[in-house]
A protein has these predicted regions:
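HAMP-domain connector/hinge
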Residues: 11-22, 111-112, 125
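Flexible, glycine-biased helix-capping/connector loops in cytosolic signal-transduction modules
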Residues: 1, 7-11, 102, 129
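Extended hydrophobic/Leu-rich segments
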Residues: 2-7, 15, 215-218
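The cytosolic transmitter module of two-component sensor histidine kinases
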Residues: 10, 18-25, 47, 102, ...
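Amphipathic coiled-coil signaling helices used for dimeric signal transmission
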Residues: 3-4, 17, 21-49, 53-67, ...
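Leucine-rich amphipathic alpha-helices with coiled-coil/heptad-repeat character
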Residues: 5-9, 36, 43, 50, ...
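… and, occasionally, acidic/histidine-rich disordered N-termini of signaling adaptors
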Residues: 64-245
Length: 245
């Protein structure tokens, strides 16, 4: 009987035509087999229920992941659209033509490390025959940074046209930007005034990497001077001014 039960045939009942102790043994085997079969049926039903529950959970989780993925794709599409808009704004800000005159020729090129940077530059003719030269970099990226870039450029250029010294222009621009900076952005700026009549370059630096001066023999050196606080951090900052000929 034991080999029969071990083979899984638990619905088999042992038939013994005797009244001795073998009958009791057979009866016990039959009882155990019936109980064991009932227990296996319960376990099988529980496993099927758990399997169904697990499949339902997997399907629900898969649906959630699909929704999350769709939401992420939508967010990414909006981010890319914003970056493209900011990129177009940046291109519109950068000048396409520069002033030229006796003793000065201006050229510019920019190679960004990322698809969108916060760099901008400008050269403007001042009323007294000198030229204002601006190189700057706004923190952050996206439309907000591009807008702050436009505000910074306009603010600095408006002040530059007054003909004030580079240190004065940066100080006034900093105070103005600190008043209109809800996102706490900042801009590093190198601003210089070049006088083609004397060959003198006066400049001030607000947190920007040092400018490089290339000599007629091709050698390049950093312009000496301090690197003061970037614009937009805090108001009432004094900027140091330097000059070279």
């Amino acid at each position: 009987a034991l080999p029969i039960f071990c083979s899984g045939r638990l619905d088999t009942h042992i038939q013994i035509d005797t009244k001795d102790e073998l009958l009791q043994v057979a009866s016990n085997f039959n009882t155990i087999a019936t109980q064991f079969k009932s227990l296996l049926d319960v376990i099988r039903q529980q496993n099927e229920s758990k399997q169904l529950e697990l499949e339902t959970m997997v399907q629900a989780r898969t649906a959630e992941l699909a929704l999350s993925n769709a939401a992420l794709q939508a967010v990414n599409a909006r981010v890319q659209e914003e970056l493209m808009l900011a990129h177009d704004m940046q291109k519109a800000i950068l000048p396409q033509h520069f002033p030229h005159g006796p003793g000065i020729e201006v050229y510019a090129a920019m190679h960004t490390a990322r698809e969108l940077g916060g760099d901008f530059y400008e050269c403007c003719a001042l009323p007294d025959g000198r030229y204002g030269i601006l190189v700057a970099d706004v923190s952050g990226k996206g439309v907000a940074a591009a807008f702050f870039m436009a505000v910074s450029r306009t603010t600095i250029l408006d002040l530059a046209l007054s003909g004030d010294s580079p240190a004065t222009v940066l100080a006034h621009a900093n105070d103005s930007l600190c008043l209109h900076n809800p996102l706490d952005l900042f801009v590093t700026v190198f601003y210089a005034i070049y006088d083609p009549a004397s060959g003198r370059l006066e400049y001030a630096n607000a947190g920007h990497p040092p400018a490089l001066l290339r000599a007629p023999d091709g050698s390049v050196q950093e312009l000496p001077g301090s690197c003061d606080l970037a614009l937009g951090y805090m108001s009432a900052v004094n900027y140091q001014e330097h000059s070279v000929v």
